[in-house]
Amino acid sequence: IYLRSDISDITGLKQVLSRISSEIEVTYIKEEKVIAKVLYPEYSEVYDEIAPAHIFGRNIEGEGFRARQCFDGGKADMNQYDTIFPKASAEESVKVAGKIALYRLMYPYMLGSSSEVLYMDYLKNNKNEIIGSCIYDKNIDEIKFMLEKFSGDRNMIERAIVVANETGFGEAAALILKYRRKKEDIRKSRYAF
Protein backbone atom coordinates (compact mmCIF):
# COMPACT_ATOMS: atom_id res chain seq x y z
CA ILE A 1 0.00 0.00 0.00
CA TYR A 2 1.32 3.44 -0.92
CA LEU A 3 -0.03 6.36 1.09
CA ARG A 4 0.54 9.90 -0.07
CA SER A 5 0.66 11.33 3.42
CA ASP A 6 2.95 11.86 6.36
CA ILE A 7 3.18 9.02 8.85
CA SER A 8 1.92 11.44 11.52
CA ASP A 9 -1.30 12.18 9.56
CA ILE A 10 -4.68 10.70 10.39
CA THR A 11 -5.56 8.12 7.74
CA GLY A 12 -8.02 5.29 7.28
CA LEU A 13 -5.18 2.79 7.23
CA LYS A 14 -6.24 0.94 10.38
CA GLN A 15 -9.61 0.10 8.83
CA VAL A 16 -7.96 -1.15 5.63
CA LEU A 17 -5.42 -3.25 7.54
CA SER A 18 -8.14 -4.81 9.69
CA ARG A 19 -9.52 -6.45 6.54
CA ILE A 20 -6.19 -7.89 5.36
CA SER A 21 -4.53 -10.69 7.32
CA SER A 22 -1.69 -11.35 4.87
CA GLU A 23 1.70 -9.64 5.13
CA ILE A 24 1.53 -6.09 3.84
CA GLU A 25 4.02 -3.26 3.46
CA VAL A 26 2.85 0.30 3.84
CA THR A 27 4.95 3.03 2.25
CA TYR A 28 4.33 6.65 3.21
CA ILE A 29 5.21 9.11 0.45
CA LYS A 30 5.33 12.87 0.83
CA GLU A 31 6.47 15.24 -1.92
CA GLU A 32 7.58 12.28 -4.09
CA LYS A 33 9.91 11.01 -1.36
CA VAL A 34 9.54 7.85 0.74
CA ILE A 35 9.38 9.04 4.33
CA ALA A 36 8.50 5.75 6.04
CA LYS A 37 7.92 2.06 5.45
CA VAL A 38 6.10 -0.17 7.90
CA LEU A 39 5.69 -3.93 7.64
CA TYR A 40 2.56 -5.55 9.00
CA PRO A 41 3.26 -9.30 9.22
CA GLU A 42 0.78 -12.00 8.35
CA TYR A 43 -1.47 -13.43 11.02
CA SER A 44 -4.19 -16.04 11.19
CA GLU A 45 -7.19 -16.33 13.43
CA VAL A 46 -9.24 -19.40 14.15
CA TYR A 47 -12.44 -19.76 16.10
CA ASP A 48 -12.71 -22.98 18.12
CA GLU A 49 -16.11 -24.13 19.26
CA ILE A 50 -16.25 -25.12 22.89
CA ALA A 51 -19.09 -27.66 22.85
CA PRO A 52 -21.87 -28.17 23.84
CA ALA A 53 -22.54 -24.56 24.87
CA HIS A 54 -21.64 -23.18 21.41
CA ILE A 55 -19.13 -20.78 22.91
CA PHE A 56 -16.30 -19.85 20.59
CA GLY A 57 -12.68 -19.30 21.54
CA ARG A 58 -10.60 -17.05 19.32
CA ASN A 59 -6.98 -18.04 18.64
CA ILE A 60 -4.68 -15.61 16.84
CA GLU A 61 -1.24 -16.61 15.57
CA GLY A 62 1.35 -14.13 14.34
CA GLU A 63 2.31 -10.65 15.43
CA GLY A 64 0.54 -9.06 12.49
CA PHE A 65 -2.67 -8.73 14.47
CA ARG A 66 -0.97 -6.79 17.28
CA ALA A 67 0.90 -4.65 14.75
CA ARG A 68 -2.40 -3.65 13.14
CA GLN A 69 -3.64 -2.31 16.50
CA CYS A 70 -0.79 0.23 16.77
CA PHE A 71 -2.78 3.35 15.96
CA ASP A 72 -3.77 6.30 18.12
CA GLY A 73 -6.71 8.33 16.87
CA GLY A 74 -6.16 7.22 13.27
CA LYS A 75 -2.41 7.96 13.34
CA ALA A 76 0.27 5.28 13.24
CA ASP A 77 1.68 4.89 16.76
CA MET A 78 5.23 3.75 16.16
CA ASN A 79 6.13 3.65 19.87
CA GLN A 80 3.41 1.06 20.35
CA TYR A 81 4.53 -0.71 17.15
CA ASP A 82 8.04 -1.03 18.58
CA THR A 83 6.67 -2.98 21.56
CA ILE A 84 5.72 -5.93 19.32
CA PHE A 85 9.29 -6.55 18.16
CA PRO A 86 10.62 -8.71 21.02
CA LYS A 87 7.85 -11.26 20.44
CA ALA A 88 7.92 -10.83 16.64
CA SER A 89 11.66 -11.51 16.54
CA ALA A 90 11.06 -14.81 18.35
CA GLU A 91 7.96 -15.93 16.43
CA GLU A 92 8.39 -14.56 12.91
CA SER A 93 10.97 -15.62 10.32
CA VAL A 94 14.28 -13.76 10.11
CA LYS A 95 13.12 -12.31 6.80
CA VAL A 96 9.99 -10.77 8.37
CA ALA A 97 11.59 -9.64 11.64
CA GLY A 98 14.58 -8.36 9.66
CA LYS A 99 12.32 -6.20 7.49
CA ILE A 100 10.61 -4.79 10.57
CA ALA A 101 13.99 -3.89 12.09
CA LEU A 102 15.39 -2.58 8.82
CA TYR A 103 12.42 -0.31 8.09
CA ARG A 104 12.37 1.08 11.63
CA LEU A 105 16.07 1.95 11.42
CA MET A 106 15.86 3.33 7.88
CA TYR A 107 12.82 5.47 8.73
CA PRO A 108 13.17 6.21 12.48
CA TYR A 109 9.94 8.13 13.06
CA MET A 110 9.26 8.10 16.85
CA LEU A 111 12.11 5.60 17.34
CA GLY A 112 13.27 5.48 20.96
CA SER A 113 16.91 4.76 21.80
CA SER A 114 16.14 1.43 23.50
CA SER A 115 14.17 0.25 20.44
CA GLU A 116 16.97 1.42 18.17
CA VAL A 117 19.46 -0.72 20.10
CA LEU A 118 17.09 -3.70 19.96
CA TYR A 119 16.62 -3.38 16.19
CA MET A 120 20.34 -2.83 15.58
CA ASP A 121 21.26 -5.89 17.65
CA TYR A 122 18.81 -7.97 15.63
CA LEU A 123 20.32 -6.78 12.34
CA LYS A 124 23.83 -7.41 13.63
CA ASN A 125 23.00 -10.95 14.75
CA ASN A 126 21.23 -11.84 11.48
CA LYS A 127 22.98 -9.62 8.95
CA ASN A 128 23.97 -12.34 6.46
CA GLU A 129 20.44 -13.68 6.13
CA ILE A 130 18.89 -10.19 6.07
CA ILE A 131 21.16 -8.80 3.35
CA GLY A 132 20.59 -12.02 1.40
CA SER A 133 16.85 -11.48 1.67
CA CYS A 134 17.25 -7.87 0.49
CA ILE A 135 19.22 -9.10 -2.53
CA TYR A 136 16.63 -11.79 -3.39
CA ASP A 137 13.89 -9.14 -3.14
CA LYS A 138 16.00 -6.70 -5.24
CA ASN A 139 15.66 -3.89 -2.68
CA ILE A 140 18.64 -1.69 -3.48
CA ASP A 141 17.95 0.95 -0.79
CA GLU A 142 17.89 -1.72 1.89
CA ILE A 143 21.09 -3.28 0.54
CA LYS A 144 22.77 0.15 0.70
CA PHE A 145 21.60 0.61 4.28
CA MET A 146 23.00 -2.77 5.33
CA LEU A 147 26.30 -2.04 3.60
CA GLU A 148 26.59 1.34 5.32
CA LYS A 149 25.92 -0.17 8.74
CA PHE A 150 28.08 -3.29 8.35
CA SER A 151 30.65 -2.43 5.67
CA GLY A 152 33.45 -3.60 7.97
CA ASP A 153 32.13 -7.16 8.07
CA ARG A 154 34.10 -8.99 5.38
CA ASN A 155 32.13 -12.20 5.84
CA MET A 156 28.83 -10.43 5.17
CA ILE A 157 30.27 -8.62 2.14
CA GLU A 158 31.65 -11.84 0.61
CA ARG A 159 28.40 -13.70 1.28
CA ALA A 160 26.39 -10.85 -0.26
CA ILE A 161 28.55 -10.96 -3.41
CA VAL A 162 27.87 -14.69 -3.76
CA VAL A 163 24.10 -14.21 -3.30
CA ALA A 164 24.03 -11.30 -5.78
CA ASN A 165 25.84 -13.44 -8.37
CA GLU A 166 23.57 -16.44 -7.73
CA THR A 167 20.46 -14.32 -8.24
CA GLY A 168 21.86 -12.49 -11.26
CA PHE A 169 21.24 -9.12 -9.60
CA GLY A 170 24.10 -7.23 -11.26
CA GLU A 171 23.24 -3.86 -9.74
CA ALA A 172 23.59 -5.31 -6.23
CA ALA A 173 26.83 -7.12 -7.12
CA ALA A 174 28.31 -3.87 -8.47
CA LEU A 175 27.21 -1.92 -5.41
CA ILE A 176 28.63 -4.50 -2.99
CA LEU A 177 31.93 -4.65 -4.88
CA LYS A 178 32.09 -0.84 -4.76
CA TYR A 179 31.66 -0.90 -0.96
CA ARG A 180 34.29 -3.64 -0.64
CA ARG A 181 36.76 -1.71 -2.79
CA LYS A 182 36.12 1.50 -0.81
CA LYS A 183 36.82 -0.37 2.44
CA GLU A 184 40.00 -1.93 1.01
CA ASP A 185 41.18 1.47 -0.24
CA ILE A 186 40.75 2.88 3.29
CA ARG A 187 42.83 0.01 4.70
CA LYS A 188 45.56 0.50 2.08
CA SER A 189 45.75 4.25 2.66
CA ARG A 190 46.32 3.70 6.38
CA TYR A 191 49.48 1.73 5.71
CA ALA A 192 50.81 3.63 2.69
CA PHE A 193 54.35 5.01 3.08
Predicted ranges, named:
Residues 7-9, 152-153, 167:
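Short acidic, S/G/P-rich loop/turn micro-motifs used as interaction or catalytic elements
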